[in-house]
């Protein structure tokens, strides 16, 4: 017979500790929890096999191809400190296994069937190294950080946003009114909530029209460029593009997409449309916690963030470190840097398993959003720096005097923090003092400080990994 039938251990073919990784390989770091009795080498090799060329038994057609050329390889395994029976398995994939310019195809292989594999109790993809040879096949973000600043004519500070609440139930007219008040007060952007699409109480076209009116009115009054993230997410790709086309016809600067619920194929199409038509693209990460919240299973958000930079988006939500949603400081800053820098060194203390060279792919602005208010402003300015979007939903609309004064309070707090930082003051230590000083000459800020003063913010405590 031409080949040897039967079942053999994965590790005989797919565990190759001597392998030297190539510059063109896609590298993955998996956190593997094997079932009792399964050795880690076998588990790591099984992951490499099932996410590349392998199947459960030797097949006749293996002889018609070159496994050595196409197989994934588990090239290193290390135990996870402090965890029983958990290992980091490093897997290298040859570039030819992936379709060019398709995040969808990359994920279908790397995080496809293998996650349901019986020999594993749990599996988590912690990080991916995307080689320039692959990232160069993607358009990436429609515009990137610098082009966005030029389009908006806003420099030297973080941008300010606000999600319009209540997220569901407002009519289009009242929704537009809320947008106008926030923009007039000094915000750069307002935002559709991620689940505002086109519901019976407010159809998308009506919302787009009233929000555009609000933008133009606020621009005329303030002399600043304003935007509202018009959510183009829809039930079909065709409908999504139709909404983006209408936004372009209205002349607004930015649209929005829920990239995980909408899917990577839809997102990449929208990103291409946005670059071709001069629209900025704001990305919301609804559903990410379903994938990334469990420590031992799923995918870390840094992988979803890298995937978004490939697929395309100019802003993406990235946790706050300080608000109501989860996000540890060093780890968050790790993937924030992966979003906006060209070159990020391997640094295990920040959860970065591989050095990532993005070459010239545009960067993405991280968005801090969720339970933040004026007392957080010094910390946010310090942690995220200038290249970020700070979004205060309740922290704007919850102001006792209304939306516009709420917006004023946030803008004054931000400008005060930026000025203090530029004068060399330590925002971590003097943050509360800086806000108090500014509130002496801004009654709007003083009122905001009073409302949220009980919600204490301890800056030092967040500094642990």
Swiss-Prot record:
It catalyses: 2 (2R)-3-phosphoglycerate + 2 H(+) = D-ribulose 1,5-bisphosphate + CO2 + H2O; D-ribulose 1,5-bisphosphate + O2 = 2-phosphoglycolate + (2R)-3-phosphoglycerate + 2 H(+). The active site is at 165 (proton acceptor), 284 (proton acceptor). The record marks 324 as: Transition state stabilizer. The modification N6-carboxylysine is found at residue 191. Keywords: Calvin cycle, Carbon dioxide fixation, Chloroplast, Disulfide bond, Lyase, Magnesium, Metal-binding, Methylation, Monooxygenase, Oxidoreductase, Photorespiration, Photosynthesis, Plastid. One of its GO terms (biological process) is photorespiration. Coiled coil: none annotated. InterPro entries: RuBisCO (IPR033966), RuBisCo_large_chain_AS (IPR020878), RuBisCO_lsu_C (IPR000685), RuBisCO_lsu_C_sf (IPR036376), RuBisCO_lsu_fd_N (IPR017443), RuBisCO_lsu_N_sf (IPR036422), RuBisCO_lsuI (IPR020888). It holds the Pfam family RuBisCO_large_N. The disulfide bond which can form in the large chain dimeric partners within the hexadecamer appears to be associated with oxidative stress and protein turnover. Substrate binds at residues 113, 163, 167, 285, 317, 369. GO terms for molecular function: magnesium ion binding; monooxygenase activity; ribulose-bisphosphate carboxylase activity. GO terms for cellular component: chloroplast. Heterohexadecamer of 8 large chains and 8 small chains; disulfide-linked. The disulfide link is formed within the large subunit homodimers. Belongs to the RuBisCO large chain family. Type I subfamily. The basic functional RuBisCO is composed of a large chain homodimer in a 'head-to-tail' conformation. In form I RuBisCO this homodimer is arranged in a barrel-like tetramer with the small subunits forming a tetrameric 'cap' on each end of the 'barrel'. This is Ribulose bisphosphate carboxylase large chain. It comes from Manilkara zapota (Sapodilla plum). The gene is rbcL.
């Amino acid at each position: 017979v031409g080949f040897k039938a039967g079942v053999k251990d994965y590790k005989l073919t797919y565990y190759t500790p001597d392998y030297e990784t190539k510059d063109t390989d896609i590298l993955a770091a998996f956190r593997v929890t094997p079932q009792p009795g399964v050795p880690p080498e076998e588990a790591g090799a099984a992951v490499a096999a099932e996410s590349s060329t392998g199947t459960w038994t030797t097949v006749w057609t293996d002889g018609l191809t070159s496994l050595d050329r196409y197989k994934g390889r588990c090239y290193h395994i290390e135990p996870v400190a402090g965890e029983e029976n958990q290992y980091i398995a490093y897997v290298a994939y040859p570039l030819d296994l992936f379709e060019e310019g398709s995040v969808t195809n990359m994920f279908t292989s790397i995080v496809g069937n293998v996650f349901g594999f019986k020999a594993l109790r749990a599996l988590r993809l912690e990080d991916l190294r995307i080689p320039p040879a692959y990232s160069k096949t993607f358009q990436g973000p429609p515009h990137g950080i610098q082009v966005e600043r030029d389009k908006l004519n806003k420099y030297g500070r973080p941008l300010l946003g606000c999600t319009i609440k209540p997220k569901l139930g407002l009519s289009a007219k009242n929704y537009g009114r809320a947008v106008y008040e926030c923009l007039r007060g000094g915000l750069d952007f307002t935002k559709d909530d991620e689940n505002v699409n086109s519901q019976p109480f407010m159809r998308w076209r009506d919302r787009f029209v009233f929000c555009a009116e609000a933008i133009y009115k606020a621009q005329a009054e303030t002399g600043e460029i304003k935007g509202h993230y018009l959510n183009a997410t829809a039930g079909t790709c065709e409908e999504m593009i139709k909404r983006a086309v209408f936004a372009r016809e209205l002349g607004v600067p930015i649209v929005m997409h829920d990239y995980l619920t909408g899917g990577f194929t839809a997102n990449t199409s929208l990103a291409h449309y946005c670059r071709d038509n001069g629209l900025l693209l704001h990305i919301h990460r609804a559903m990410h916690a379903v994938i990334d919240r469990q420590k031992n299973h799923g995918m870390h958000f840094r992988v979803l963030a890298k995937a978004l930079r490939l697929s395309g988006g100019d802003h993406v939500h990235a946790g706050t470190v300080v608000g109501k949603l989860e996000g540890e400081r060093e780890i968050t800053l790790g993937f924030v840097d992966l979003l906006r820098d060209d070159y990020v060194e391997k640094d295990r203390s920040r959860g970065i398993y591989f050095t990532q060279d993005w070459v010239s792919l545009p960067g993405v602005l991280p968005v801090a959003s969720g339970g933040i208010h004026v007392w957080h402003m010094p910390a946010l300015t310090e942690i995220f720096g200038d290249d970020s979007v700070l979004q205060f939903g309740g922290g704007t609309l919850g102001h006792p005097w209304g939306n516009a004064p709420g917006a004023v309070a946030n803008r004054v707090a931000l400008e005060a923090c930026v000025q203090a930082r530029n004068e060399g003051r330590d925002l971590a230590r003097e943050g509360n003092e800086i806000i108090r000083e500014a509130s002496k000459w801004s009654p709007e800020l003083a009122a905001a400080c009073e409302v949220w003063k009980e919600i204490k913010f301890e800056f030092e405590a967040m500094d642990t990994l």
